[in-house]
Regions:
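Glycoside hydrolase catalytic-domain context in secreted enzymes
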Residues: 1-430, 451-806
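Short beta-strand elements
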Residues: 430-449
Length: 806
């Protein structure tokens, strides 16, 4: 096939064997089911209540039995042929002779939920119906085993327990609708059980001797109601498992799959135990990241007294079998610490285990978390008695800390003198210090940098002892430029009114003169091609282009007279998102939090590859995923779309996803760069964060992905970072991303940002989506606020990215 043929508005050309489509194929759906099972986490299993014994009769309680949430809303939504809920999954197991299901109860929930759907409700945003005593008694007569399912939904553009701020911000539009609906359904906030859910749970606990709980959620929720409850024997964190999530859950409940997932977050006793909760809703216009680097387990394992506030630690997850492990060797050579760990299945069932390596740096002058994840490995399936040796590697320089105030060496990563402990285990709390210590004899600078994206108005930050230190204040002076436009008017022009009509493939083949394909074929260099383009040509490249085919998130490129294709973009993190009106059903993959909970880079890479095949088959070139922001707070409405509270786990998972995607010569777009940890007023909220926390927590996962997977594109975020829109932040986009990390790809804005287009271009943000503002760039050029060289540089990066596309 000729290069870019799919971008020239051609009919879909199937990628499968014998002319079959891979989009939504049985093979991809099977992979989605398998991935879902790999990431579900068994939190509790008293008296081996799970797996359910063959032939057991079960009663399925809670609307979540049929009201299955496959994933979150917004860019993470996917159009699918079907969604398998838990009732349907358990009925399949019944057909296989493994369980018997009390249908009358499930049908009661099904009838109620279908009525709520007909009235406009969406999965997860429904009311728990009252459980009639008569039906409860019938269920108890049928069986002594109950399965309760609790489900939750959240989405792009609104936060959980979204409250009107105290500084004048008024919720409107979708934010207002979703927050009002959430408040109506979840009177205690959706972190906790509703009154109706709690009443149902209490009834079931009293009536049934065997109670199992399934949590169909996208992120952190309250766990204290089942953590120490003797009446509840087992709890499965099933997450939002994609289109086959209900069947994947049934696979685990019935023992066809042995759970091997591990938590990618810390589950505290109460919402208020997370340091971010205190100020998450303090203002709609800023968030002070005063907890600094002490996010998630870094807080709970370090700050005095915080450890006792944890219900389930980071990295925790049970299995149906037992494992023993022992360190068989530890050494350092050429700046890399290597630890060999032998894992043995000592139980009676086949299963997998995850070995986690943490390091503990000396407190020194900077202060450090007690433990930091440094490496991890998952075993293959081990049969009873089988063993496997895992090799975990930790580069010494990975243990360095960033000194933003000059306590050791200003604006540098440093290894402070002292002993660096190594811990091995299966979660952060149980990880034990091994008989190996790495010693740094004197303070050592591993990388000298310069101050970038530092705060102006963050007044204080947390230290390792739980106290706070004052931070220096400074004033921001904006670079001279055009008077700013009304930010609420920005984004109104539509690409369909600005973009040029594209060129179809046959016309492209017949075109004469210089063609962009000459660059791809090696007949001329990209620089030679750039010399032919006028300034107007370059400016036209810097904005989004019209949709074609089944795409709905617009394109990039599109200079028909030069044969530059209009390459399409598409959401999103849970699968290829195509509008229902197009009639294309794709595969809905498990949510990102579940994928991170697999702790399996190879599996995530397979998911990325399969998803990219669907993107490519539908003539789309850039997949707007993965989303890699940190789980700073459980209240962020988009956490389901992100991987973890830990930047190393998020970075390794994201890098695996990018490798899988780009193996198909489809561009991944890693987002949202950076510190986009709140959805309320997301286009105008300022993340005030220290440079150290920014570099060690909120940028580190992006750095790992850039250096290990080389993504074609990065998407800058809506929010401001220390007073400057991320899309206009030159220190971030050029100084850190390109100059320090060596990123050579394309930077795109998120869709319809509040940033000024010409300022974004100057900062290193190459294209404004979904629409550009060429007149504004021309005005800035004429008045000397942007140069032709800056414009051409971004245009060149756009064309260079298109050259990478198949």
């Amino acid at each position: 096939m000729a290069k870019w043929q799919r971008s020239f508005f051609q009919p879909v050309l199937p990628l499968g064997e014998d002319g079959r489509r891979v989009t939504g194929s049985k093979e991809h759906i099977a992979l989605s089911r398998m991935a879902a099972g790999e990431g579900m986490v068994l939190l509790k299993n008293e008296k081996n209540a799970l797996p359910i014994r063959r032939g057991t009769k079960v009663a399925l309680f809670g609307k979540g039995t049929v009201d299955y949430v496959k994933g979150g809303g917004g860019s993470g939504d996917v159009t699918v042929e079907y969604i398998r809920n838990l009732y349907e999954g358990m009925k399949i197991k019944e057909d296989e002779g493994k369980v018997e299901v009390f249908d009358k109860l499930a049908k009661y929930y099904e009838k109620d939920i279908q009525k709520q759907y007909a009235d406009g409700a969406v999965p997860g945003m429904t009311v728990e119906p009252e459980l009639p005593d008569e039906l409860l008694n019938e269920a108890r007569e049928y069986t002594d085993t109950a399965v309760i399912t609790i489900c939750r939904f959240s989405g792009e553009g609104w936060d959980r327990k979204c409250e009107a701020a105290q500084d004048g911000y008024v919720l409107d539009g979708e934010e207002k609708r979703n927050s009002e609906l959430s408040a109506k359904i979840f009177e205690n906030g959706d972190f906790c059980l509703t009154n109706a859910e709690n009443a149902m749970v209490e009834k079931v606990k009293k009536a049934f001797p065997h109670v199992i709980v399934v949590m169909n959620v996208g992120g952190i929720v309250d766990t204290k109601w089942f953590r120490d409850c003797d009446e509840i024997q087992s709890v499965l964190m099933a997450w939002q498992g994609g289109m086959e999530g209900g069947l994947a859950t049934a696979d685990i409940l019935c023992g066809d799959v042995n759970p091997s997932g591990k938590l990618s977050d810390t589950y505290a006793k109460d919402l208020e135990d997370y340091p971010s909760t205190a100020n998450f809703h303090e203002s709609a216009f800023y968030v002070d990241y005063t907890e600094d680097i002490y996010v998630g387990y870094r807080y709970f394992e370090t700050i005095p007294g915080a450890a006792k506030r944890v219900n389930y630690p980071f990295g925790f997850g049970l299995s149906y079998t037992d494992f023993d492990w022992k360190v068989t060797g530890a050494s350092e050579e050429n700046g890399v610490i290597t630890v060999l760990t032998e894992v043995t299945n000592t139980g009676k069932k086949a299963g997998k285990e995850v070995i986690q390596l943490y390091y503990g740096a000396p407190q020194g002058k900077l202060g450090k978390p007690a433990k930091v994840l440094g490496a991890f490995k998952k075993t293959s399936i081990l049969q009873p008695g089988e063993r496997q040796i895992l090799t975990l590697k930790l580069p010494v320089n990975q243990m360095a800390s960033y000194d933003d105030l000059g306590k050791v060496c200003k604006s540098a990563y440093v290894l402070e003198a002292g002993e660096y402990a190594i811990y091995i285990g299966t979660n952060v709390r149980d990880a034990a210090k091994i008989d190996f210590t790495y010693v740094v004899k004197e303070d050592t600078v591993t990388e000298q940098l310069s101050r970038k994206a530092a705060p102006y108005h963050l007044q204080k930050r947390m230290l390792a002892d739980g106290s706070y230190e004052e931070l220096p204040q400074r004033e921001y002076v904006e670079e001279e430029g055009l008077p700013r436009q009304d930010k609420y008017a920005i984004g109104l022009p539509c690409p369909d009114t600005r973009g040029q009509k594209g060129i179809d493939f046959l016309d492209f083949l017949d075109s004469k003169g210089v063609r962009f394909s000459d660059v791809a074929d090696g007949k001329m260099t990209l620089d030679e091609f750039m010399d032919i383009l006028t300034l107007d040509d370059c400016i036209n490249l810097l904005g989004g282009q019209p949709n074609t085919g089944c795409a709905n998130t617009f394109g990039m490129g599109n200079l028909p007279e030069y044969g530059v294709p209009n390459v399409m973009t598409a959401d999103g993190p849970a699968g290829l998102r195509i509008l229902p009106k197009c009639g294309v059903n794709t595969t809905a993959w498990p949510c990102a939090t579940l994928l991170a909970s697999t702790w399996d880079e190879e599996l995530v890479e397979k998911v990325g590859k399969a998803g990219a095949e669907e993107v490519k088959e539908n003539n789309i070139s850039i997949w707007l995923t993965p989303a890699c922001n940190i789980h700073r707070s459980p209240l962020c409405g988009r956490n389901f779309e992100y991987y973890s509270e830990d930047p190393y786990l998020a970075g390794k998972t994201g890098a695996a996803m990018v490798r899988g995607i780009q193996s198909q010569h489809i561009g991944a777009s890693v987002k949202h760069f950076a510190a986009n940890n709140k959805e309320t007023n997301r286009k105008d909220s300022d993340s005030r964060v220290s440079e150290r926390a920014l570099r060690e927590i909120y940028l580190k996962q992006f750095e790992i992905i850039v250096k290990e997977a080389h993504p074609y594109t990065i998407m800058s975020s809506y929010n401001l970072i220390n007073g400057i829109h991320a899309s206009e932040n030159k220190e971030l986009l050029t100084g850190i991303l390109r100059d320090e990390w060596g990123f050579d790809g394309l930077v795109t804005t998120d869709w319809w940002t509040f940033g000024e287009h010409y300022r974004e271009t100057k900062a290193g943000n190459d294209i404004k989506m979904a629409a550009g503002y060429p007149e504004r760039i021309k005005e800035a050029y004429e008045k000397g606020f942007i140069t032709e060289a800056e414009t051409r540089l971004s245009a060149r990066r756009i064309l260079n990215m298109i050259l990478k596309i198949d």
